Amino acid sequence: LKSMDLHEYGKLQHQLAVDLDRNINIQWQKHAYPLIASFTYSVKEIEYMARVIDRTGGGKNTVVVISLGQHFRPFPIDVFIRRALNVHKAIQRLLMRSPDTMVIIKTENIREMHSDAERLSDFHGYIQNLVMMDIFQDLNVSIIDAWDITIAYGTNNVHPPQYVVGNQINIFLNYIC
């Protein structure tokens, strides 16, 4: 894969890697608000996930991976529910126009308990995790249960160590291969 420079500003810039010989195109982009970060980032590229999904053509060689969670913790649960429902509807539309598209939902990681526990604790994450499982249960999507994986490893880190992320990636690869 060759990483492409998209000439965007900040740490959370859109990422693109391609392999033209194998027809592989991997993209990553930050989600829209709420977006909590301790560094600067450009707001001009921010898009809601539902809009990005609606623009995705889909097909048997297309995999869409979505993760909702951490940045919603400090906000009322209805903000998270509304966003998850909008993503659910967008996935429904994607699967109607292109049923061979694979959609994978990655749950959030547990996190450390010493950083602003009142607003960011796993209590809020657990509720969001339950809500997400309920909202997406009727769709033909696969789940990477990062919540259970990070509990099993006892990492207590919003950005778990490489070996934990590696196991999450292995589950992803098992779904698509």
Locate the predicted segments by residue.
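Extracellular glycan-modifying ectodomains
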Residues: 1-177
